[in-house]
């Protein structure tokens, strides 16, 4: 009589999250071992220093072999060499593509080229992030940009599909790609108070409203490129400040609506025309690439700084922008309402986000 025996062999790849973090942060094996010793792991586990060294080296070898798969995350899902549960695969991918706020602020809006990569030594010194980690993050930005730059469809969806990132991280990468493509200036001294989150918020609004994809979901590069026709049309808004009667009527409508509601009413009334000229002239200049790049510099100079110097609270800024935008619909001589709404709807959201200390 013969009996059959089924044998199952498991070789699940073990991933130590703490060691993975040390590897991602760019620490050498020696430094990683020292940090693990400092954490008290030898006392907790009863292991020897030699075992800890061997364990760390084994993990580093595994991560090094996984790295080429992490460059194209769908490959990690479909390979058979490493037996890694789906939840662990998602963690590996998400953390590999995560980035440091201090690092992204240094490269946001810059061309993702060799020229910028040469600056990584200085960025590493300035931020305290290891050079190896800076390189990984920069290469990730560049890799995502290269994959999605020629694709049709939603930028966020394309990033999620090809890199399997969470919705939040995919949206952050969409902002990075959008800023790199349009080369927005973010490094000037007067912009240093702004966080990556501030810029990412504005990028999302612009992608939704000012790109080719905002008006035609079948357009090539729809979420990467600003709608040039829209930018050209914005010159039509100049009539709001060039026509004295329209400017006076606009001011009158806003002041009538806000009298008694703003703590800074007298400051607003005195500065209305300067603020309006600033906002409208920003729009009219967006036909030039340099002025597109300087958008955030102009918004801070023309609106944020004047209001801040007069000590406007955020609530008053919100009241003003809402009424300033809405009152244009009551100007009988103005015929570009849809264009105005497309411009100010996005600009209002951006300005409210940019208005803080």
Swiss-Prot record:
It comes from the Eukaryota. Its main location: nucleus. InterPro entries: FIBP. Keywords: Acetylation, Membrane, Nucleus. GO terms for molecular function: fibroblast growth factor binding. The modification N-acetylthreonine is found at residue 2. It is found in: Nucleus; Endomembrane system. One of its GO terms (biological process) is platelet aggregation. It holds the Pfam family FIBP. It is a peripheral membrane protein. GO terms for cellular component: endomembrane system; membrane; nucleus. The keyword Protease does not apply. The keyword Translocase does not apply. Binds to internalized FGF1; this interaction is increased in the presence of CSNKB, suggesting a possible cooperative interaction between CSNKB and FIBP in binding to FGF1. May be involved in mitogenic function of FGF1. May mediate with IER2 FGF-signaling in the establishment of laterality in the embryo. This is Acidic fibroblast growth factor intracellular-binding protein.
